[in-house]
Amino acid sequence: MIRKTWVFMALAVLIVASCTKGHTDTQETMQDSTWVTDTLTSDSVAEVEEEMDEAVEENRVDGSFDDFIFTFTRLPHLQAQRTDFPLPLITAEGEETTVSNRHEVGDFGFLGGDYYTVLYGSMRELEAEHDSADSLVKVDRVDLESQSMRTYTFERLNGKWHLTRLHDRMFGEDILSDFYRFYAQFSSDSTFQAQSLAPQLHVSIHDTEDELSVIEGTIDASQWTSFCPEVPSGIISNIRYNQHYTRQSIVMQKCGMGTGLQEVFVFHHDGTGWHLKSYED
């Protein structure tokens, strides 16, 4: 990997140029993707589903939670097989009840789109390998607009992952409540977002003219609107393996579903409020 150090103005010009080219490439890619999608035959779709079914039958989806959840969100019959009805549910009012059908469980569209998000307490946690021996993982569906969330708890039982319970609650009951309230406004209010950037924002982006090269440096907060990537908004996810959160730092990883692409947003709390400190793609 080649690293380039640019003076402030040079970096600014290059970033704007890079983004402009990136938008053009993205549009072309989207057009190509649309064409490919439109030309897929029902046979090819069935073939993909058949491959997933074979993976389930051969127990290849239970090696790690990441493997399992990717398949689980795409195969309704697997969801039916691996959901332990009646499913215990704690409501937002604190009442204990049960869910007896898939409709009440809700869909997993928040994990089946173009991307999903995971929050970590540090870069070290993000870079660490997920433990294949994990036996319990929680998946949060976070609604930033209503400031509510539903937690899906998955447990590995007899070697296979199962959805075992649900928990609905408002932000105030979660350890990340302060950050979620901040991020709900950060992702929906451009003025607030601009005010919540570190004075010197560290960026690390891939050079569109050389995929093996990385452009690294700092930009002024005022340049963020020209460079600004699409920040996750609306309904986001958080897969909780065994992260340890503090009130000083949150690392948000935006992962392309099945593409291997990722963006990383690092937020810090300086005692007065949360600020975006760095961004990398």
What does each model-identified segment do?
Residues M1-A17:
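Sec-dependent bacterial lipoprotein signal peptides
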Residues F68-T98, R102-H103, F192-H206:
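Short, well-ordered alpha-helical segments enriched in acidic and aromatic residues
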Residues D140-D174, G260-D281:
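Short beta-strand edge/turn micro-motifs at domain boundaries
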